[in-house]
């Protein structure tokens, strides 16, 4: 005498920082990135926010690239573009200056926008898959990591800039020393993208 239905739902558990990319369009993500990086120009309203320490009180780590590395025209082009985004906040799924970036969105954007490599938008695993493994990394190569969050395969990627340093989209985009125990424990490989 009645109709009944079975509804099967699969839920995916992910960090709250991933929510904006699922519920916002590109214009909204752009505004969200600006808001989060400036705390709406009202950091006094967010005294306990982690963003105060990340973006306002502690600017990204500066690092001077040795001049001899910049004699490589390809690397100089790459790093000139990449440094434009120092301090941009991490936004899961972000892949442009308008939305800000996640790690693979940042690397894909820099490679493609410079015209050095037409990767399109790839994830960290996709960037690894198109790169040639190298044992002696040079500035402009990519550095890959596993286990930085709960996913299979490559979970993080950065641009190797020489002297055991990388430029990557952590939170915010900044230079980072690869000799720390964290990065050493998650290191997977170096790779050279298919430069034009």
Task: Give short role names for the model-derived ranges.
Residues 1-89, 184-196:
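Intrinsically disordered, low-complexity
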Residues 88-139:
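Catalytic cysteine-centered active-site loop
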Residues 116, 124-134, 149, 153-196:
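Aromatic- and glycine-rich peptidoglycan recognition patches
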């Amino acid at each position: 005498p009645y109709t009944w239905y079975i509804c099967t739902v699969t839920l995916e558990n992910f960090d709250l920082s991933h929510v904006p990319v699922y519920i916002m369009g590109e214009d909204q993500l752009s505004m969200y990135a600006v808001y989060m990086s400036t705390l709406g120009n009202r950091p006094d309203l967010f005294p306990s926010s982690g963003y105060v320490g990340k973006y306002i009180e502690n600017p990204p780590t500066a690092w001077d690239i040795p001049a001899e590395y910049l004699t490589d025209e390809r690397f100089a082009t790459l790093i000139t573009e990449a440094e434009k985004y120092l301090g941009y906040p991490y936004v899961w799924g972000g892949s442009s200056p308008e939305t800000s970036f996640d790690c693979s969105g940042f690397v894909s954007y820099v490679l493609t926008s410079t015209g050095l490599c037409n990767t399109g938008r790839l994830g960290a695993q996709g960037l690894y898959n198109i790169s040639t493994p190298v044992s002696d990394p040079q500035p402009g190569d990519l550095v890959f990591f596993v286990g930085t969050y709960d996913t299979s395969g490559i979970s993080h990627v950065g641009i190797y800039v020489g002297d055991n340093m990388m430029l990557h989209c952590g939170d915010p985009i900044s230079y980072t020393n690869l000799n720390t125990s964290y990065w050493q424990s998650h290191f997977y490989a170096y790779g050279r993208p298919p430069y034009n």
